[in-house]
């Protein structure tokens, strides 16, 4: 089983996160940020992983530190669980419609960190959640997993729908990339290492 558990404690947050890439059971997610709980639940469902997150943060300031630190911890867990990345597809992509919105994700588990985030999130807040934190979250995930991650909203009107389409597309693309392919011997790179 490809699993990982990490604890990250700073002066601003305390994060406990575990992931199982090979078995999907009910995930338990409690971040103190309701909208993020919703998005992580969708991500876990569509990536077909088990994700458990317990976070306490300085949300009396805002959700920035909590969201970013969860992204960091998720990225570190993904990196550890994937280990040497033997026989995985490596690449994944997905288009996901959410009512009037269409989200797209393409990713490469290359060992090289990069984020392209192309999403016009016209509503700056959803409840008390700052929508600019979506990019911060994915930046933290991409750089700590060491993945090349491209996310784009092709069109849409409702900011919630746009973000939901991105999280679902990310989950589905990640599932494709982490799937073990018996036709791939070793790692999926001419370099022999990812």
From Swiss-Prot:
Top-level EC class as recorded in UniProt: lyase
Annotated keywords: Amino-acid biosynthesis, Cytoplasm, Histidine biosynthesis, Lyase
Claim: Ribosomal protein is one of the keywords in the record: no
GO biological process, one term: L-histidine biosynthetic process
Catalytic activity: D-erythro-1-(imidazol-4-yl)glycerol 3-phosphate = 3-(imidazol-4-yl)-2-oxopropyl phosphate + H2O
UniProt subcellular location: Cytoplasm
Pathway, per record: Amino-acid biosynthesis; L-histidine biosynthesis; L-histidine from 5-phospho-alpha-D-ribose 1-diphosphate: step 6/9
GO MF terms, alphabetically ordered: imidazoleglycerol-phosphate dehydratase activity
EC number(s) reported in the record: 4.2.1.19
Principal cellular location given in the protein's record: cytoplasm
CDD domains in UniProt: IGPD (cd07914)
Record-linked Pfam families: IGPD
A GO cellular component annotation in the UniProt record: cytoplasm
Similarity annotation: Belongs to the imidazoleglycerol-phosphate dehydratase family.
HAMAP family, sorted: HisB
Name of the protein: Imidazoleglycerol-phosphate dehydratase
Species this protein is from: Listeria monocytogenes serotype 4a (strain HCC23)
Gene name linked to the record: hisB
């Amino acid at each position: 089983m490809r699993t990982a558990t990490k604890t990250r404690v700073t002066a601003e947050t305390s994060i406990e996160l575990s992931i199982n890439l090979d078995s999907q059971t009910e995930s338990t997610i409690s971040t103190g940020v309701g909208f993020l709980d919703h998005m992580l639940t969708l991500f876990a469902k569509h990536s077909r992983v088990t994700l458990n997150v317990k976070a306490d943060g300085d949300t009396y300031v805002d959700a920035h530190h909590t969201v970013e630190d969860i992204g960091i911890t998720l990225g570190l867990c993904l990196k550890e669980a994937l280990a040497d990345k033997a026989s995985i597809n490596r690449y994944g992509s997905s288009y996901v419609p959410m009512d009037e919105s269409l989200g797209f994700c393409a990713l490469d588990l290359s060992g090289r960190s990069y984020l392209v985030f192309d999403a016009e999130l016209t509503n700056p807040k959803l409840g008390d959640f700052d929508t600019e934190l979506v990019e911060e979250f994915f930046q933290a995930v991409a750089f700590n997993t060491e993945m090349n991650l491209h996310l784009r909203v092709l069109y849409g009107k409702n900011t919630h729908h746009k973000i939901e389409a991105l999280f679902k597309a990310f989950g589905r693309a990640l599932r494709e990339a982490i799937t073990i392919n018996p036709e791939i011997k070793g790692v999926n790179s001419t370099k022999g290492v990812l």
